[in-house]
């Protein structure tokens, strides 16, 4: 910070002794030392804050880069999946359409004016494959047993010594005498 050698420090000390006197010099030196320490702590705090902000900015940029890369991967996967699904549906419809045309029914299969149903999809019925959704209200309404035990009001309070005595085997108990 400052380039103060031993000779410069001694010169400053002598000037301070002459100007302030021997009575006030120790008090001023303590105050100056405390102020210097505070200044150093403040500078170190500012440096640490700046370095944290720089790290946060770097992490934010990394996060945005990662999110954009994930979005790009997701869109490419979805595009490829849609493309392959379209090809599969086209192949399926051409195969099913060829079988229906060979069966002898004239006209287009599944047209709005005809009574013939549309060609089935290769996936089958969507209702049969739909996952059964459970009723989450049942799960939400059930209170866990551990919570019931932890929060219930105790009707029979027992001290630690009484609890130990209650669960101690009879062979280890001391005989009780009243007189």
From Swiss-Prot:
Q: Which UniProt keywords apply?
A: Cell inner membrane, Cell membrane, Membrane, Protein transport, Translocation, Transmembrane, Transmembrane helix, Transport
Query: What top-level branch of life does the organism fall under?
Result: Bacteria
NCBIfam families xrefs: tatB
Locate the transmembrane regions by residue number.
Answer: 1-21
Instruction: Give one GO term, molecular function aspect.
Output: protein transmembrane transporter activity
Name by which UniProt lists this protein: Sec-independent protein translocase protein TatB
Q: Where is this region: Disordered?
A: 101-134
Q: Which Pfam families match?
A: TatA_B_E
